[in-house]
From Swiss-Prot:
Residues 1-25 form a transit peptide. Keywords: Membrane, Mitochondrion, Mitochondrion inner membrane, Transit peptide, Transmembrane, Transmembrane helix. Gene3D superfamilies: Cytochrome C Oxidase, chain K. Residues 61-81 are mitochondrial intermembrane. One of its GO terms (biological process) is mitochondrial electron transport, cytochrome c to oxygen. It is found in: Mitochondrion inner membrane. This is Cytochrome c oxidase subunit 7B2, mitochondrial. It is a single-pass membrane protein. One of its GO terms (cellular component) is respiratory chain complex IV. It comes from Macaca fascicularis (Crab-eating macaque). Belongs to the cytochrome c oxidase VIIb family. Residues 26-33 are mitochondrial matrix. Its main location: mitochondrion. The lineage of its organism: Eukaryota, Metazoa, Chordata, Craniata, Vertebrata. The chain crosses the membrane at residues 34-60.
Length: 81
């Protein structure tokens, strides 16, 4: 059971957040902001940097990955007793 004070606080927060989201949606931007101008370029350059860093790490620093033993492991001869 909620106390009346907590219930009133929660209900006012819900109403306030609904009103704020309505005000945000009705607001019209007059000029593009940083994300509108450079968002895709920043995303693409960050993705390219991460891909290059991982490719370098995977190929150049000498990690032995041991992905599959097929073709590298030969079975030993079976010893009959």
């Amino acid at each position: 059971m909620m106390f009346p004070l907590a219930r009133n606080a929660l209900s006012s927060l819900k109403i306030r957040s609904i009103l704020q989201s309505m005000a945000r949606q009705s607001h019209v931007k007059h000029s593009p902001d940083f994300h509108d101008k450079y968002g895709n370029a920043v995303l693409a350059s960050g993705t390219a940097f991460c891909v290059v860093a991982w490719v370098f790490t995977a190929t150049q620093i000498g990690i032995e990955w041991n992905l599959s033993p097929v073709g590298r492991v030969t079975p030993k001869e079976w010893k009959h007793q």
